[in-house]
């Protein structure tokens, strides 16, 4: 009877160890991808800012170019 009891405790302990090890592995993988995305986010942010700035400049130039064509009835 004691042998069964100890073996069940060992089984539960091993299962808990596997569960904790799995959680640590998932956290390590997630943190790696987070770090990679943070590392390259500044490059993409700069490109996005340039594209937005160029689009606003184009709109402004179009509107300013059409100011002389405005007529007041």
From Swiss-Prot:
InterPro entries linked: Class3_signal_pept_motif
Post-translational modification: The N-terminus is probably cleaved by the prepilin peptidase EppA, which recognizes the class III signal sequence.
Proregion span(s): 1-10
Sequence motif QXSXEXXXL, location on chain: 11-19
A GO CC term attached to the entry: membrane
Effect of loss of the gene: Disruption of the gene does not change the piliation compared with the parent cells.
Main localization of the protein described in the UniProt heading: secreted
Record keywords, A-Z: Fimbrium, Secreted
Factors inducing expression: Expressed under standard laboratory conditions at 35 degrees Celsius.
Cellular localization per UniProt: Secreted; Cell surface; Fimbrium
Source taxon at top rank: Archaea
Domain-level remarks: Contains an amino terminal motif QXSXEXXXL, which is part of a class III signal sequence.
Name of this chain's protein: Probable minor pilin MMP0528
């Amino acid at each position: 009877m004691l042998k069964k009891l100890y073996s069940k405790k060992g089984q539960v302990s091993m299962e808990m160890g596997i569960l904790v090890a799995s959680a640590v592995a998932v956290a390590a993988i997630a943190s790696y991808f987070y770090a990679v995305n943070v590392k390259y986010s500044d490059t993409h942010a700069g490109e996005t800012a340039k594209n937005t700035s160029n689009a606003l400049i184009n709109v402004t130039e179009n509107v300013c170019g059409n100011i002389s064509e405005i007529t007041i009835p």
